[in-house]
């Protein structure tokens, strides 16, 4: 690797490629790797040969599941690419990729425009304030419409698009693009050398008026941002390409607007100008805000880490992946300082020492060893034992904890039973490894049945995890039916509930008296439980108060309606009493547990279920059937709109009603409709449905 790229961070771009499933994201990444000289044969997704899709299931299903990190070079600049999945079950992968990126390329299907998952990923990028450029792909596709797609970016995403290119031709006759900055045409003729050569030409006469119109819009928009440019523009002078680029770069990095480019990655057209745009408009590590962390053990003390080799070392682990030879690869983004392979660092999140065995820069699943990791770059580390996703690694003398990531709770679970005793041991290893890799994959043991329960973000998510257990860990197991993660909550407050725990059996007994109030708590911000110590006058000794809290939390693991975990409760300890000899932490914990149960019974407990935001895109002929079917699944239709010759139906539907939906939708629409769904919120289960669930749980 060129030394100047390591030290000159203006020549580094850490980017993600983000999109809806099937918008052509992996193909676009493949073309980038081809033109930057890393891939000699282009891998096609539909051949199962794409380089970035390196897990066996990805190559079979043609969708990207794991964000592999890849390094390549273009025009003297190093581009580190994180490939992100476009399927909603894998939002955790998208979330953790965006957290460590400086910029992104949003890929859109030129026929479909903004699709449901494009919207989800866009919102996640907004959350982390990631600057973006847009690539309208598949311009060779039947029905492709560049201006329709640009319109959906504005209408559905509420973003300001800035057109930087115009397509030359469309569908089969798509031949290239008009570059509005330099006012020239770039054309790719035929398949010679896989699109590596393009011709710079005069703008075709039939496009000249349109090109002048959009060039004027571009110049006017950038002139508004700078007084010197505005003066020049109002004086009738044209702006130079360099002036336009500098102004667009500034606007893009501030996320004020989003430059739009177009092409067809599959047909090898338009990829190189998009790579130029990555360098011209997306930020280097020096252009983004410095990383803010906090002191270990004290979140109120802020510590800033700048992307500089002279700063103390700090890095964030954003992905853990199993590797066939090295055991475990930990992907990190280094935010400050330098660290050499073989060094000892501290996992400041967990307070554990770690030794970095080897360091690599990755090309998909191939490793390129390096001697040291430097600020602003992305690496894979070997040898870290304790580190998991979201942990901070830092210099042991100057520790810092960087802002971590938030992951959604799983909404679906299945029971899994190993077929033989040998499988039992292998299952344990498989589950441990997979849980290290994926924070949204959770495991628990059902105390009553002894079954292992695995939980995830959707049916596809669990399917793939089970598939990986079979392939990678050779576990043969029976998998049960998917189960919904119900919750329980309360609908009204109970102002006073007393409980006395008293036990006398010779010797010292047990005594604890508590009085609590409970009230419903809004869970919209992710707070599911709050404990308030409102005891006055030392009626409950201070050392026993955490025990009451622990007892209440333990009771919340099992609700009174059907035994599902309780959420949305604010509990206040308002009074109580202790005995000098017989009181203990255990006595107060038991009292806390029992008083909550009693109070919840009086607080109108109800069952909650996960509700999914469902979007169905269907030909108009099947609209009635699709809506009727969603209504029959207790769905609430939120909206219906026209999109590129089809209808888009948005609805909220309980997850329990969505099992097997893919097959039903296929048969109702002859395979012509597509849908996506993701978790939206928890809502109260209607009484008649709740009664059925309770009966089932009780085995009636």
From Swiss-Prot:
The keyword tRNA processing does not apply. Keywords: Cytoplasm, Elongation factor, GTP-binding, Nucleotide-binding, Protein biosynthesis. GO terms for molecular function: GTP binding; GTPase activity; translation elongation factor activity. Signal peptide: none annotated. GO terms for cellular component: cytoplasm. Its main location: cytoplasm. Pfam families: EFG_C, EFG_III, EFG_IV, GTP_EFTU, GTP_EFTU_D2. Residues 10-286 form the tr-type G domain. It comes from the Bacteria. SUPFAM superfamilies: EF-G C-terminal domain-like, P-loop containing nucleoside triphosphate hydrolases, Ribosomal protein S5 domain 2-like, Translation proteins. Belongs to the TRAFAC class translation factor GTPase superfamily. Classic translation factor GTPase family. EF-G/EF-2 subfamily. HAMAP family: EF_G_EF_2_B. Catalyzes the GTP-dependent ribosomal translocation step during translation elongation. During this step, the ribosome changes from the pre-translocational (PRE) to the post-translocational (POST) state as the newly formed A-site-bound peptidyl-tRNA and P-site-bound deacylated tRNA move to the P and E sites, respectively. Catalyzes the coordinated movement of the two tRNA molecules, the mRNA and conformational changes in the ribosome. This is Elongation factor G. It comes from Kineococcus radiotolerans (strain ATCC BAA-149 / DSM 14245 / SRS30216). The gene is fusA.
